[in-house]
Amino acid sequence: MRKVLVVDGTFLKSKYKGVLLVATALDGNSNLYPIAFAVVDSENDRSWNWFFRQLKVVVPDERALAFVSDRNNSLCKGLENVYPLSQHGICIHHLLNNVVTHYRGKGVVGLIAKASKAYRVVDFQKRFEAVCNISPAIGEYLTDANVTKWARCQFQGYRYDIRTTNPTESINSALRSPREYPVIPLLDSIREMLTRWFFERRTRSRKHTMPLTIAIEKKIDRRINKGKTFLVQPVNEHRFLVRGDTIDCLVDLDRRTCSCGKYDLLKIPCRHAIKAGLTVSRAPSSLTDFMYTTSNWRTAYEETINPIGVPDDSWVVPNTVRNASVLAPESRRGAGRRRKRRYETVEDKLRSSQGAQEKKRRRCSRCGEENHNRATCDRAI
């Protein structure tokens, strides 16, 4: 399991509103692995502090731990108070949306996205300098946002390939209907979802016979194909110079590093490391971090998520709970109909525009020509 937690909040749509706070990780097969849920009145300082204190009971604070979130002030304060040792990264989607909303600059969004994805510091610096040349104001804003929080190669810890809050967005999407339920049915729906996920993945991992998880095996196969034409020059027993890509790369198989940066940051051998390993009969699985192994994947789903087997009328409720005074949640209904679909991000718009350009042109079903349809066709048949 990668030690990266994605945290976010999403609005509930029941009578009393409120917010569902979520913390999730990704397993070795890149599937969602929810860690914690909480229902609170709103995303304020007290709510996030309380949530992180409960989370700390099962996920201790350490320097190897990383969080990825948006730039919500209360969330950031809660992390600083409860998880001072951990590293905090921000979602690149939210950062790009802020840039588009408040600044102008032709082509700057694509450059920022590429800079955030760079594995080498030199590549990041080239792209970031290009952004600053186009718009010094945007460069200043990105610097103030703290480069170490949004640029992968500048991050103080390891965030692997988790650059956005998409994992929590995916959970929110899976709970689209339950988010309209009252609290108890909502929590039971979450439990049912987790029970189903754990059973399906437990079954799937037990059937899988390869040393690495399904997603990583596919990734390794693609990299093997990309590196077929590379030339390997040994430096010593475990260091190799790999030529044939856009840059020559120095690979150290024992230290599990490559000068391209990808092996160092993802802990999965890059195509250069795979090619070097194959020349000395070292399988890619032996060069991959344990978190991506099938055995570790199976361990993650050994336990089961059990339903509550006691009928409601047989529950033993402690007097402290029975006598507690439960206040109505703080909520205000907004004007108009509540939006159910999430707002489209900048990268969503970029992808949709690219898809529109590649879309197949429509033809008239009568004559087969373009730029009109059957109803307006005046061609002679």
Predicted regions mapped to residue ranges:
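Acidic/histidine-rich, metal-coordinating catalytic segments
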Residues: A64-S74, H94
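Short Cys/His-rich zinc-binding micro-motifs
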Residues: T257-D264, R362-H372
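Active-site beta-loop-alpha junctions of metal-dependent nucleic acid enzymes
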Residues: K15, F37-P60
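Hydrophobic, aromatic-enriched, well-ordered structural segments
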Residues: K56-V58, A64, E80-G89, L96-R337
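Short Cys/His-rich micro-motifs in 6-15 aa windows
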Residues: A276-V280, C364-C367, R379-I381
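Short, intrinsically disordered linker segments that flank or connect zinc-binding domains
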Residues: T246-C249, R339-E358
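Cysteine-centered loop/knuckle micro-motif
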Residues: C270, R374-R379
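An active-site-proximal beta-strand-loop segment
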Residues: M1-P34, D41, D45, Q154-F155
